[in-house]
């Protein structure tokens, strides 16, 4: 655990209406360069002890060195999964897979007019970033996995959900365990 005395604990204010989260406001400070450098050193030291590495980028500055971390992990033969953030995915190049949600994917590649257009845009992004795969979570439309050998679409089972917080985290964690155990992508 890295401690940065200059950083206060993030406080998250959630605004709820009719049992659903309407918005969240975060009060926080950015970690120092020294703390981030120490985190990178700790990551490198612990890397041999894992089979897969999961990065959830919340855009808060904690993954400033993610490009280097991905490079180190892949060089060590590790599976690297990234839940991305923002509109520039170049820093995730070389990961095994990234898992943007539908709106994050649109932010990066633009709108698509149909499934064929989405497949084309996903293939272009996957190739540009040298990824093995790209998984787009699509809310009520399920999820779509894009690999060099084609696309796989998994439909969603509709449910009334009051708070979708953590849904993407659940997807990437499940995928990490499956891939670390040698499961086939299609499973």
For each feature predicted by the language model, list its residue ranges.
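Conserved N-terminal subdomain of the carbohydrate kinase-like
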Residues: 1-52
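Short, charged, surface-exposed secondary-structure boundary motifs
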Residues: 10-12, 92, 107-110, 161-165
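Buried hydrophobic positions in well-ordered alpha/beta secondary-structure cores of metabolic enzymes
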Residues: 13, 53-56, 143, 168, ...
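Active-site donor-binding loop signature of nucleotide-sugar glycosyltransferases
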Residues: 18, 27, 100, 156-157
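A short, flexible beta-alpha/helix-coil linker loop
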Residues: 21-22, 29-30, 104-106, 159-160
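Short glycine-centered, acidic/aromatic-flanked micro-motifs in structured strand/loop junctions
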Residues: 27-29, 55-58, 177
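Conserved phosphate/ATP/ADP-binding segment of small-molecule kinases
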Residues: 52, 60-151
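Conserved post-catalytic alpha-helical subdomain immediately downstream of the catalytic base
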Residues: 132-133, 157-187
